Amino acid sequence: MHKYRTHTCGELSLAHVGLQVKLSGWLYRRRDHGGLLFIDLRDHYGIIQLVFNDDCSAVQAEISKIKFETVITVEGAVVARSNETINKNISTGDVEVVVSSYVVESFAEELPLQINGEYEAPEETRLKYRFLDLRGARLHQNIVLRSKVIQELRNQMLSNGFIEFQTPILTASSPEGARDFLVPSRLHPGKFYALPQAPQQFKQLIMMSGFDKYFQIAPCFRDEDARADRSPGEFYQLDIEMAFVTQEDVFGLVEPVLYNTFKKFSNYSITNIPFPRITYDESMLRYGSDKPDLRNPIQISDVTDIFQCSEFTTLKDSINCGAVVRAIPAPMSANKPRSFFDKMIEYAKHLGASGLAYIQFTNDGVKGSIAKFFDEALLARIKKLVKCQDGDAIFFICDKENDATKVAAKIRAKVGEELNIIKTDCYKFCWVIDFPFYQLDSEINKITFSHNPFSMPQGGIEAFNKAKTVEDLLSIKAFQYDIVCNGVELSSGAIRNHKPDLMYKAFAIVGYSKDEVDKQFGAMIRAFCYGAPPHGGIAPGIDRILMLLTNSVNIREVIAFPMNQQAEDLLMGCPAAVTDKQLHELQLKLISKERIK
């Protein structure tokens, strides 16, 4: 018989009744039923109930004193449970093991957190003792699912003829939207490597090396603040690049990969292929966001022109000063009590809005705080444009376009939540396309890239040459796209710029000289000069896919050893100070914050 086990704790069934077995695992739960002592033994595969009979009173006394999570090995006979004691909640619930002997393999100290799920410890404790936290069923299953999802993604890519690559982790710094993690070079004092924010340049170079289809389960490193859906430090993505493809070719690959993965690991309904395509401008108008949550059926409308024709003097004055008016419908809420509308007004003020107007289309006529300013013809226009019917209400926000867009998005979400019309058992996918190539950084009043600087502008170099004003530049669209699910951006992607003259021009507009471009992107620019194929790609985030599949509230629930929101690894105690010897080898010296100032 094997030293530790003949079976796992999750595989025993009625087919094993009568067998002598050996099991090893963690002492999970204990119940003393007066003469009979029951122990739940847990391993990676499941839970089995152990029985210590009353003819082993000395053994019962010993095992009763052992702390939870002690590792033990037991021998015993598999027996069927009586009908009234069958446990349908576990896979081994039809049987139990009557123990004849046991050995303690490793004692556990008093636990800093409970494993059995009776209450959840503070996150700081969970992260500090992550090896204990990972024993809990939910987190343990999430990590197992992570492995299965990655395997599924890999299998689908291989079946589509892709080649898996591994690109360098130590590379050069490049401006990709976030701060780099820098690694000092011992052999080249004063110089630094950077951990890759993404394998962007390498995967494009792979296309220029004559390969046709690239993928990688890629680690990415970005020194940025944490969010619920973003881990500080590192994350993983399914990095994809293809040669000789159009935007629709990329969509045609990615849609079945995501659809099949979500179908395999969830019983929720999923958007049918092809996924809807929504332009960036339409998304910002209809949903107030470039990450639309299509589970919420409410769509925002622009009613500025109609309000311009009304008798609402105050808002007309605001419109004349550059404001816009957005309408947010509230289906079947016209007869809601006044408290509903007051609550929404207070919420809008909390968001920074000066107020929130509304109209109610009741069966008894039109009511609401601003109904008196509109004649029947204008009300009919509003109703038609916003696609409302009797029984609906409409909220209105008036402000500068950016502010109105942000507030309208929040009001849309709040109305959907209050009316309980946001579906929770589905995955709603869409593509957001035609992103602006450039954006205006209002803080420094300067043109910057809106997304990936390596994307292809629609219209090519002619679009740059025709642009005479800042507004012209901001109107240039890129072959850039995002895949969004339930309001979560799973990935950005683009058809790449593969022409040197176009690359220099694109960077010159944001202030880069030719020498600076050559210095930062020399390898890629050189490759462009030796026959670069048209190419494009995308990189769905694996952590975010898992967040959606597990209904996790934050990304740390799908990562085995995550950092906290302050970018600290509480388990390993990092970031940490290093020795003077290490600094000397790197020819580095620490200076105080006061001296930096």
From Swiss-Prot:
Homology family: Belongs to the class-II aminoacyl-tRNA synthetase family. Type 1 subfamily.
Physiological role: Aspartyl-tRNA synthetase with relaxed tRNA specificity since it is able to aspartylate not only its cognate tRNA(Asp) but also tRNA(Asn). Reaction proceeds in two steps: L-aspartate is first activated by ATP to form Asp-AMP and then transferred to the acceptor end of tRNA(Asp/Asn).
SS bond list: none
Gene3D superfamilies the record matches: Bira Bifunctional Protein, Domain 2, GAD-like domain, Nucleic acid-binding proteins
Entries under NCBIfam families matching the protein: aspS_bact, PRK00476.1
Enzyme class, first EC level, given as a word: ligase
Catalytic reaction(s) noted: tRNA(Asx) + L-aspartate + ATP = L-aspartyl-tRNA(Asx) + AMP + diphosphate
Region (Aspartate): 200-203
Subcellular location: Cytoplasm
Name of this protein: Aspartate--tRNA(Asp/Asn) ligase
GO-annotated biological processes: aspartyl-tRNA aminoacylation
One Gene Ontology MF term: aspartate-tRNA(Asn) ligase activity
Species, as recorded: Orientia tsutsugamushi (strain Boryong) (Rickettsia tsutsugamushi)
Pfam assignment, any one: tRNA-synt_2
Sequence positions that bind ATP: R222, D223, E224, E489, G541, I542, D543, R544
